[in-house]
A protein has these predicted regions:
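Non-catalytic, alpha-helical, charged scaffold/linker segments
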Residues: 1-32
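Functional-site microenvironments in short loops/helix caps that host divalent-cation chemistry
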Residues: 14, 33-221
Length: 221
C-alpha cells in the first residue's frame, strides 16, 4: 500500500498490507446448544484475517489482459469510489460483519442505546429472496426473460456473449447504481460482481431443506 506524503507515518509511505490483521472470535452456537456440558472456551472460535482485500486480483484473474491501470487505481483512486469492492475472501467478509457489529455496538454503548444483535452475511435463501424483489418464478431481478430493455440496453453488467465482456458496454465492473434496482430497491442483484452468502448454493436444496431453516450446510437438514 502506497501513501501520499500528507498521510505518511514517521516518513514511511509504503506498507505491507498483509501484516494488517484483524483478530476476532465467534461462538459455535449450534454446538453450545447441542452439547450443554461444553465449557464456554470449547465453543469459542478464534480467528485472524487480513484486513485489506487482495489488490492483485485484476492481474491474477485476467492474466492475459492489460489490467495494470485497474490494478494501480481501483482500490484507492476517487474515480472508483462508487464501484464495488473486489478481491474479498469469504473469511474477510465474515470478519467485516464481526467488526461492523463491534463498531456499531461501541457507538450504541456511548449513546446508552440497545445493542444490535449481529451483522452477518445473508444465507443463500435470504439472498435469493432479496434478489427476486418480490417476483415469483422470474429468471432475473427485473423479471425477464429478456436481458435487454425496450431500447436495446442490457439490464445488468455481465458477459452476454461467449468471450465478449464488452457487449454490454462495461468491460470491467461499473458503479453500484449504474443499473436500475429491483422492486426492493436493491442494486446489483444480478451481474457486476459476485456476492458472498453465509451458506453454499445447492440446486437441489428445495428438495431436502426445511422452510424453517433453509441452510444447506446445516447437518440437521
Amino acid at each position: 500500500m502506497y501513501l501520499p506524503m500528507s498521510e505518511s507515518y514517521n516518513g514511511q509511505r509504503t506498507w505491507d498490507v498483509k501484516k494488517f490483521k484483524f483478530q476476532f472470535q465467534t461462538m459455535d452456537i449450534k454446538s453450545a446448544a447441542k452439547y450443554k456440558e461444553l465449557k464456554r472456551s470449547d465453543v469459542l472460535i478464534k480467528e485472524e484475517i487480513e484486513v485489506y482485500p487482495d489488490t492483485t486480483v485484476w492481474i491474477r484473474d485476467f492474466a492475459y489482459s492489460y489490467n495494470e491501470p485497474m490494478h494501480n487505481d481501483y482500490f484507492w483512486h476517487e474515480a472508483y469510489s462508487d464501484y464495488p469492492v473486489v478481491g474479498v475472501s469469504w473469511e474477510q467478509a465474515q470478519a467485516f460483519a464481526q467488526w461492523r457489529t463491534i463498531y456499531k455496538n461501541g457507538y450504541q454503548k456511548s449513546k446508552n442505546k440497545d445493542f444490535v444483535n449481529k451483522y452477518r452475511l445473508p444465507s443463500e435463501a435470504e439472498w435469493e429472496y432479496a434478489a427476486r424483489g418480490g417476483l415469483q418464478g422470474a429468471t432475473y431481478p427485473w423479471g425477464g426473460p429478456y436481458t435487454k430493455n425496450d431500447r436495446g440496453c442490457f439490464m445488468a453488467n455481465f458477459k452476454p456473449l461467449r468471450g465478449d465482456y464488452a457487449a454490454d458496454q462495461a468491460l470491467y465492473t461499473v458503479e453500484a447504481d449504474a443499473y436500475e434496482p429491483n422492486d426492493y430497491n436493491l442494486y446489483n442483484m444480478a451481474g457486476n460482481v459476485s456476492e458472498w452468502v453465509l451458506a453454499s448454493y445447492d440446486p437441489s436444496s428445495y428438495e431436502y431443506t426445511s422452510t424453517m431453516n433453509p441452510d444447506v450446510n446445516d447437518v440437521d437438514n
